[in-house]
Design a protein with these regions (language model features):
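Detector for C-terminal structural segments
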Residues: 43, 220, 224, 229, ...
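A bilobed periplasmic-binding-protein/Venus flytrap-type ligand-binding module shared by bacterial periplasmic
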Residues: 78, 228-232, 288-317, 466, ...
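N-terminal lobe/hinge region of extracytoplasmic solute-binding protein
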Residues: 46-98, 129, 209-210
Length: 537
């Protein structure tokens, strides 16, 4: 007998008994579903990989910047597509002395790594010294900068001369802060001999050691990199997805996949490819459309026997033999001829009236004077379908080859997969090279400090320190000037002289396009990390 709340017999109808019986049967036979489990929220990003590793001290390519921006946090950073106003990262506040030689940062007391360990100044000192001493491709960012920690929450960066660009430099993902205890326990070193002593590269391919909203799940240099949500993220802007898959996909396939909905974001479409995509995607453009630029470099130490790239007349022949308008037409809507090395996004950029104009007669006269006649000249580039912003390196190289052949050169295209061609270029082993540059930090000094004699790209062209005092003097003045108008004037003059005297020829600035599914929010193009995976929801 069933009793009511007051101890009286409770009447139960036949219908109710039947209902209970049916419900019991459904439960015992497993026909009633268990409470629903929330579906995993994934984001798939497709791009043509420019990637060497996810170790901040060794990664300096666009895809690496995109990934590391989500794994590691820097002292300062930027929001959205902006690259002019720094905002807090690991540092909650900062100050600069009057001479722009001392930069003091206070670490946010809430900042924690993915394992829950508190971020301290010791982690910052270790990370930046490791970057400097590993001597990887981004190590030059720490040139002339000394890091110290007066206490556990304060970091001081010191320079010997005025270096106002330090605040921009510290936003680079290469200056991402690592958990020093974890990295040291897995072979990491920040000692002066870290270029040989540091053994953490392989470890950092298997898991990350940062404080960002995502952690590394898996890494494959040729197929995909997978990130998982950092469930212990300390910041206010939590990860928007449980998992992000960054895939290495050819440009034409990126277009098909984003239309079908099998990917969320396509990174590398050209303006022409970003048309007629249907009503399920958004096309995003940004200021970064004028940040990347393609250029042709000539190596003055490659082949003394031919003396081609060391001869000013040979360089003049190339400079005035190229049909720049044809290249811009190939680059498509939104592209412009690069009038100088510093793109129009930054201070001191040149206008189109300063751009080099093709002069075939002058080019042929210069070619005759340089005296190489039938000597073959090789042009290296990222082959095997390599493309950025929808521009195929091989197609651009073919346009340049056509122009040079028309004035008498015997060019030979020697493109190769990026794993082969990029080291050749960086190690000063290409006679000529067709390459792209995106800023390492968002300031015009990134260009003066990278393309002048004796600098990173200068040395790749065999342009040693002391090769051109005019260029070097302008570079030095621009790097230490703190007055904005004077800086801009120096940057402009430096470029005009580069256009006359350097072994580098700026070609084109392509439009930057991102295509994203309409369900994806927060997609903006950025000049340093292209897509801020941390902001996408």
């Amino acid at each position: 007998m069933n009793l009511g709340r007051k101890g009286k017999p409770m009447k139960i109808s036949f219908k109710k008994v039947a209902s209970i019986a049916v419900s019991t049967a459904l439960v015992t036979t497993g026909l009633v579903a268990a409470p629903a489990i929330a579906a995993t929220k994934n984001l798939t990003v497709e791009t043509v990989f420019q990637l060497t590793s996810t170790d901040p001290a060794r990664s300096f390519e666009q895809t690496g910047n995109m990934i590391n921006r989500a794994l590691y946090e820097t002292l300062l950073t930027y929001k959205g597509g902006d690259a002019s106003t720094q905002v807090p990262g690991i540092a909650s506040k900062w100050s600069v002395n009057a001479g722009a030689t001392e930069f003091t940062f206070t670490i946010d007391s809430r900042a924690k790594f993915a394992d829950g360990t508190k971020v301290t100044s010791a982690d910052v000192v270790f990370s930046l010294n490791r970057l400097k001493n590993v001597k990887g491709n981004p190590s030059s960012l720490m040139n002339g900068i000394t890091v110290s920690a007066p206490n556990a929450s304060t970091v001081v960066l010191t320079t010997e001369k005025a270096t106002p660009q330090v605040l921009a430099i510290v936003t680079s993902p290469a200056l991402g802060i690592l958990n020093s205890k974890v990295v040291k326990a897995n072979g990491g070193s920040d000692a002066a001999d870290a270029n040989t002593a540091d053994k953490a590269l392989e470890f950092l391919k298997t898991q990350s050691a940062g404080s960002g909203p995502y952690v590394l799940s898996s890494f494959n240099l040729t197929t995909e990199v997978v990130l998982n949500k950092n469930t212990k993220y300390w910041g206010a802007a939590k990860a928007g997805y449980d998992k992000i898959i960054v895939r290495n996909v050819p440009v034409n396939v990126q277009r098909l996949n984003v239309i079908k909905g099998s990917s969320s974001i396509a990174v590398d479409l050209s303006p022409d490819q970003a048309t007629n995509l249907g009503n399920k995607v958004n096309v995003v453009t940004g200021k970064a459309s004028n940040v990347f630029f393609f250029y042709l470099s000539q190596n003055s130490t490659f082949s003394p026997a031919t003396k081609f790239t060391a001869d000013a007349k040979c360089i003049e022949a190339v400079r005035y033999g190229i049909n720049y308008k044809k290249i811009v037409r190939y680059a498509g809507l939104g592209a412009i001829q690069a009038p100088g090395i510093i793109p129009s996004f930054f201070s001191g950029a040149l206008s189109q009236k300063d751009a080099i104009v093709q002069d075939t007669a002058r080019a042929k006269t210069a070619f005759d004077a340089c005296g190489i006649k039938d000597t073959p000249v090789s042009i290296g580039y990222w082959g095997d379908g390599g493309a950025v912003n929808g521009l195929n390196f091989g197609s651009l190289a073919a346009l340049v080859e056509e122009d040079l052949r028309a004035i008498g050169f015997k060019p030979k295209l020697t493109g190769a997969p990026i794993a082969v061609s990029l080291p050749l270029y960086r190690d000063n082993k290409e006679e000529m090279g067709l390459w792209l540059w995106g800023p390492d930090w968002p300031d015009s000094t990134n260009y003066t400090e990278s393309f002048s004699p004796g600098t990173k790209v200068g040395l790749r062209m065999g342009w040693a320190a002391g090769s051109d005092s005019v260029i070097t003097n302008l570079q030095t003045q621009a790097s230490t000037e703190t007055n904005a108008k004077k800086r801009a004037a120096l940057f402009a003059e430096w470029q005009r002289e580069m256009n006359k005297r350097s072994p580098l020829i700026p070609l084109v600035q392509p439009a930057a396009i991102l295509v994203a599914n309409k369900s994806v929010r927060g997609v903006q193009d950025h000049p340093i990390w292209k897509v801020n995976l941390s902001e996408i929801k």
